[in-house]
Design a protein with these regions (language model features):
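N-terminal soluble domains immediately following signal/targeting peptides that reside
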Residues: 21-181
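Bacterial N-terminal signal peptides that target proteins for export
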Residues: 1-8
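C-terminal segment of classical bacterial N-terminal signal peptides
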Residues: 11-20
Length: 181
């Protein structure tokens, strides 16, 4: 009986944490001549206007055989980016720069907290340096987006020394809370 309760508790805990961050946008980038897989989205999906949320950022050296797969065998976590990268959260004409904190449970993860205050398009822009190269990389929410949002393999220069090789997935824009009477 106790074993069954522990098993069910573990499943419940996993399902709650797994559903809290399922929609992120992945970009395969060449920064200063080196490949990086950067993934950005909201900490809680979908984000609700007025509720605590935040930006969740992951950084890896990609597996050359499967470069957009954040679970690929040859992927390597990138640490220390909280010292060189910040995020600008923009909603229309209003923006705020926030610092990242490294996750204690995942060395590839960086987080920051904010409260979405409007139902509008939010842009998370990573700024700072990666591989000693200045970056300015934007991720824009898309209403109803998720990990299955179609990708794009068109190369594009994002900023000097930064080329986007591929992009896939997406994260949803904030939606209003529904009140239950």
């Amino acid at each position: 009986m106790i074993g069954s309760i522990a098993f069910l508790s573990a499943i419940l805990l996993f399902s709650m944490t797994a559903s809290s961050a399922f929609a992120h946008m992945r970009q395969l980038l060449t920064v200063g001549g080196k490949h990086y897989l950067l993934e950005v989205g909201s900490q809680v999906e979908p984000p609700y206007v007025g509720d605590k949320n935040g930006v969740q950022f992951f950084a890896w050296t990609p597996d050359p055989k499967d470069p957009l797969n954040d679970s690929a065998k040859g992927i390597k976590n990138i640490t220390g980016l909280d010292k060189t990268v910040t995020v600008i959260v923009s909603a229309g004409p209003v923006s705020k720069r926030l610092d990242f904190t490294p996750s204690p449970s995942n060395t590839a993860e960086y987080d920051t907290t904010f409260y979405p205050t409007a139902q509008t398009t939010y842009t998370y822009t990573l700024v700072g340096k990666i591989n000693n190269t200045p970056i300015h990389i934007s991720y824009r929410c898309v209403p109803g987006a998720g990990d299955d949002t179609p990708g794009n393999n068109t190369k594009a220069t994002v900023s000097p020394g930064v080329v986007r090789d591929m992009v896939a997935g997406g994260y949803a824009c904030p939606i209003p809370k529904v009140s239950i009477p």
